[in-house]
């Protein structure tokens, strides 16, 4: 049985991904800071903050030890802030990048070693049309998703020789 990890899988797009993986016979782990409001039978929740490298490392180690493989990682965790750049606090902008971009980086970095050990895998990074369109009053969301797009392209080339596909 293949194993899928979905970050931010407790609601919305992430929850839909979890359900689709279940339908297709995957063992599914959902990583989020909070327990899901809606429990999905068959989805194993692990409390994890994607901005905390130790938290991510421990979660992935547990999943790999329990399941013997990590075949797909869906980097879905993220959020958006709205407002004019001139009124946005630096701490808010940094938090946006911490979750949307650095969370994606931390999770990808930590899963690659397991995928290399098993001879391949797939990393899916969720982005947004806001990345190329740079939506007014969502500058930091747009910028964080544009950074995810660049990371995705660079990482895809780095790990291609190890049969790891990134999109």
Feature-to-residue mapping (PLM):
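Alpha-helical segment proximal to the catalytic Tyr-Lys
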Residues: 113, 157-161
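Active-site helix of classical SDR
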Residues: 108, 144
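Conserved glycine-rich Rossmann-like NAD(P)H-binding loop of the short-chain dehydrogenase/reductase
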Residues: 24-38
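N-terminal Rossmann NAD(P)H-binding glycine-rich loop of SDR-like oxidoreductase domains
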Residues: 10, 18
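Substrate-binding pocket helix/loop in short-chain dehydrogenase/reductase
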Residues: 84-85, 89-94
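Residue(s) in the substrate-gating loop at a strand-loop-helix junction
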Residues: 128
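The beta1-alpha1 cofactor-binding region of Rossmann-like NAD(H)/NADP(H)-dependent oxidoreductases
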Residues: 48-58, 90
